[in-house]
Each structure stands twice: as C-alpha cells, then as structure tokens.
From Swiss-Prot:
PROSITE patterns the record matches: ACTINS_ACT_LIKE
InterPro entries in alphabetical order: Actin (IPR004000), Actin/actin-like_CS (IPR020902), ATPase_NBD (IPR043129)
Annotated phenotype, changing residue 326 to A: Temperature-sensitive. Reduces nuclear migration in mitosis. Strongly reduces interaction with JNM1
Protein known as: Centractin
Impact reported for residue 294 to A: Reduces nuclear migration in mitosis
Record note on quaternary structure: Self-associates to form an actin-like filament of 8-10 monomers. Component of the dynactin complex composed of at least ARP1, JNM1, NIP100 and ARP10. Dynactin comprises a short rod of the ARP1 filament attached to ARP10 at its pointed-end and probably associated with the capping protein at its barbed-end. The rod is implicated in dynein cargo binding. A sidearm formed by NIP100 projects from the ARP1 filament and is implicated in motor binding.
One GO MF term attached to the UniProt entry: structural constituent of cytoskeleton
Additional remark text: Present with 1580 molecules/cell in log phase SD medium.
Source taxonomy: Eukaryota, Fungi, Dikarya, Ascomycota, Saccharomycotina
Record annotation: effect of changing residue 185 to A: Temperature-sensitive. Strongly reduces interaction with JNM1
Alphabetical keyword list: Cytoplasm, Cytoskeleton, Dynein, Membrane, Microtubule
One record GO biological process: establishment of mitotic spindle orientation
Consequence recorded when altering residue 6 to A: Temperature-sensitive
Length: 384
C-alpha cells in the first residue's frame, strides 16, 4: 500500500475518534486530551411546539440532546459496540467534525476511528463506505480500542480489560503483538448496568424511570452511587445487618430524594455474574483468566502482572479491587497479579490513538481512499 507523503502528514493533522457506545471522544493527533466529548445519542422533540419563541429545530445531538432530554425521545445509534442506526451515527459524526472540531473540510484529514473487537465485518464495511463516500475522508485506519489503550499506558505487553457502555473485552498483547485467538468479549456493559438498576429501583423503591430521558437520570445515578463489592456474599450479610453506610441518597431532578441500598452493588454485579440477567457468559474475571490461559505458557506471567483497565465502566468504585480479588482467587495465589488503573482511563483509548497517529512509522498504515476505490474488499480486511 502506498505511503502518504511526508508533506501530507505534516500539513493535514489526523483526526482521532474513539467511537464509544456511550460517549464519542474526538480530537486531533498529538494533543493530550480529546477536544470533543459528546454523548452518543440523537433526540427528537416528543411534544408539539405551541409558541414561536424557544428552541429552534426538532433534532438535537450529543450533549445538547442530553441537556434537553426531558423534551426529547432519545436514540442510541450504537448497541453493544455495533452501529445499528447509521442515519443517527452520521448525524453525530457530522456534528462532532463540523461543529465541535470546526473542520472546514474533513476530506483533507486522515481519520483514525475505533471499532469494537470481534465486530461483524459488515459493520466495518459500512463504516468505511460512509466515511469514504459521505465524509470524503482521504485516508482511514480502524483500530482495536484495547491496542490504543496499551499505547497510552506506555507498555508493549499487557492484558487490556476494556469495559465501556456497550461491551467488555479482554485483549492480551505481548511485545506489541495482539494475540487474536485469545481475545474474548461479552456484550454486557454500562448500559446493561443502567437497565438493571432501572428494574431494581422499580422493585425495591417503587420508582419507575423507564422513558429514554429518565434512562439518562438512572445512568447518572449509577455513576454516582453504584460500586463493585469485593465479596458479594459478605456485602449482602452487612446489608442484612442494617449497616447504614451501604445506603446512599440520590436527588432526582424534580427534588425528590430516594434511598438506594443493595441496588448499589447488585446492579453492577452483572458484569461478574451475568447469569443474574439470564446470560451465559462466564463473567469478567473468568473471561480475563481464560484469555490469558489461551496464550502460550511462557507468556502468561507477564500478562498477569500487567492487567490494564480501560473504559468508563471500569471507573465504577471498587472495580479494580474486585478484579484483583477474583483473579487471586482463580490463581489460588500462585501468580503475581497487578491491576493497572490509569487515572484517565475514560480517555486512554483516544490518547493512544493520538500517540499512534503521530508516529512516523504509522504513516504507511493508512488506507487511502484511492486504494478503497480500487479494491474495497481487500481494504476492508486491512482495516484492523
């Protein structure tokens, strides 16, 4: 594949997009943090307008839709890491690129974008087609988010545990080489915790918050009060004994306050015990161990001592402690296990993309639009 010229790379700063199910992060190569942090949602007004003044338009995108959620019916284009609503996805990309990043011509910039590991090839094909044809990007690279998170950590070896809004994955990488046969994924993430909390609140507190706008309220509640218990059985015993520090109060937008008790740790427990919601996955700790056990025997020790957390869901209180507790139990104390939890792990995927696209050695990896036009099938297989 032809390299982009040095002048091309110099005068056309690459754009980096971490295309998350919950929040889309976007910005320019070489910068320390993303310039755009927008909720990945689109909202349409659900009421008839009766006055000329007030809000203009009937479609709102990203953070604007989040702010006006009470007036809107919200749509989430990405479900479990897969784009299901391409029209809404295009609206979000257009808004982020043109309005937030204020790009005059996206076609003059190479674009790195993330895609969940083990996604259907059809999703990547559609993504490439939309970005090349609709947005006219000049060059494209589609990356595994876990690989970028490892770049951001400054390491070349580690098992990346990436948990976002739509899915969780475990990706072992050794000395810069991804080990695809050992990658694992489960389609449970932060959105499922939010949904579980919705059901539990109705059952335990009689609070019904099920509209698309109310779902965002519950998402905020999850982020503020939920946590992972290190030992779920002991936590249940403490709760039954009436321990008051396990109860948290959350204020709803209408001023009502509700007490959240054992739902605080029961809702996120689905990550580690998916059978709670009737799914057959083994749980995140088991999945991490299975990924590492799939690699060659000689590679396991350095992977166990470099387990890197990435994604917004890993910022739940107690997440790292729970992973360590479970993995030490699974290895029966025979291996040294180290959990690495970067303080900015919500953004480490984007930061890794910013670093990667700035390397001179990366320039040969871009897929140019001319290559895609010549042989799109071959190019799809290169967008990894």
């Amino acid at each position: 594949m032809d390299q982009l010229s040095d002048s091309y790379a110099l005068y056309n700063q690459p754009v980096v997009i971490d295309n998350g199910s919950g929040i889309i992060k976007a910005g320019f190569s070489g910068e320390e943090r993303p310039k755009a942090l927008e909720y990945c949602l689109v909202g349409n007004t659900k009421y008839d307008k009766v006055m000329l003044e007030g809000l203009q338009g009937d479609t709102f995108i990203g953070n604007n839709a989040q702010k006006l959620r009470g007036l809107l019916k919200l749509r989430y284009p990405i479900k479990h890491g897969v784009v299901e609503d391409w029209d809404s996805m295009e609206l979000i990309w257009s808004y982020v690129l043109n309005e937030v990043l204020q790009l005059q011509n996206i076609g003059e910039h190479p674009l790195l974008i993330t895609e969940a590991p083990m996604n259907p090839l059809k999703n990547r094909e559609q993504m490439a087609q939309v970005l090349f044809e609709t947005f006219d990007v000049s060059a494209l690279y589609v990356s595994n988010p876990a690989v970028l998170s490892l770049y951001a950590s400054g390491r070349t070896t580690g098992c990346v545990v990436d948990c976002g809004e739509g899915y969780c994955s475990t990706v072992p990488i050794y000395d810069g080489f991804a080990l695809p046969a050992s990658m694992m994924r489960m389609d449970i993430g932060g959105a499922d915790i939010t949904e579980q909390l919705q059901f539990q609140l109705r059952k335990s507190a009689g609070v019904s918050l099920f509209s698309s706008s109310e779902r965002e309220i519950v998402r905020t509640m999850k982020e503020k009060v939920c946590y992972l218990a290190k030992n779920i059985k002991k936590e249940e015993e403490k709760y039954l004994q009436g321990t008051q520090d396990l109860i948290s109060t959350f204020k709803l937008p209408d001023g009502r306050c509700i007490e959240v008790g054992n739902d605080r740790y029961r809702a996120p427990e689905i990550l580690f015990s998916p059978q709670i919601i009737g799914l057959g996955y083994d749980g995140l700790s088991d999945m991490c161990m299975q990924s590492i056990w799939k690699v060659d025997l000689d590679l396991r020790k350095p992977l166990l001592s470099s387990i890197i957390l990435s994604g917004g869901t890993t910022t739940l209180k107690g997440f790292g402690d729970r992973m360590l507790w479970d993995l030490e139990a699974l290895t029966k104390g025979t291996s040294k296990i180290k959990i690495i939890a970067p303080s900015e792990r919500k953004y480490t995927t984007w930061i890794g993309g910013s670093i990667l696209t700035g390397l001179s050695t990366f320039q040969r990896l871009w897929t140019k639009k001319s290559d895609w036009l010549e042989d799109s099938t071959r190019v799809y297989s290169n967008l990894m």
